[in-house]
Amino acid sequence: MAPSRKNKVVKEEVQVSLGPQVRDGEVVFGVAHIYASFNDTFVHVTDLSGKETISRVTGGMKVKADRDEASPYAAMLAAQDVAEKCKSLGITALHIKLRATGGNRTKTPGPGAQSALRALARSSMKIGRIEDVTPIPSDSTRRKGGRRGRRL
C-alpha cells in the first residue's frame, strides 16, 4: 500500500539575492580596482571593505591576440562586462582605485586605464571617488639597466 500524500508539506522556495537588499533609487557603492600595466589591464570590483570580490575581468579574457591585452579596446570590453555584472547584483555606484605597476618600475598607468574608467562612467554607473594607489617607494631598490642605463 502506498503512503498517503495528504500529510506532505509543500516547501516554498525563497529567492536568494547575492546583492544587498535596497530600495529603488538608493545608491549602493562598490570599489573598482583598475590595474593598468603595459602588458594587461585588470578591472576588479569588490565590496567597500575590499574583501569580497564581485567581479574580475582582464583585457586578456576579452581579446585573442596577446599583443592586444593591454589595449584600450580590451580594457573597455572588460569594464563593460564588470559594469553589467555589478548592475545585476544591485551595485549602482563605484569608487575607483587606479594603479600602475609602480615600485621600481614605471609609475604611469598603461594605455587601458583611461578607457576602462571611461567605460565604467558611460555604463550608467555613478562614480564616487577616483584615487591613484600606485605603490611609490620612499627609497627604492636599484632599478634594472645598469650604471649606463638601457641603450637603444
Swiss-Prot record:
Q: Does the keyword Ribonucleoprotein apply?
A: yes
- Basic residues bias (residue ranges): 143-152
SUPFAM superfamilies attached here? Translational machinery components (SSF53137)
An MF annotation (GO) of this entry: structural constituent of ribosome
PROSITE patterns recorded: RIBOSOMAL_S11 (PS00054)
- Keyword Ribosomal protein belongs to the record: yes
The GO cellular component terms are:
cytosolic small ribosomal subunit
Keyword terms: Ribonucleoprotein, Ribosomal protein
Which N-terminal residues, if any, form the signal peptide?
none
Where are the annotated segments for Disordered? Answer: 131-152
Q: Which GO terms describe its biological process?
A: ribosomal small subunit assembly; translation
- Annotated Pfam families: Ribosomal_S11 (PF00411)
Tell me which PANTHER family the record gives: 40S RIBOSOMAL PROTEIN S14/30S RIBOSOMAL PROTEIN S11
Concerning its family, UniProt says: Belongs to the universal ribosomal protein uS11 family.
Q: Any idea what this protein is called?
A: Small ribosomal subunit protein uS11A
**Species the sequence originates in:** Anopheles gambiae (African malaria mosquito)
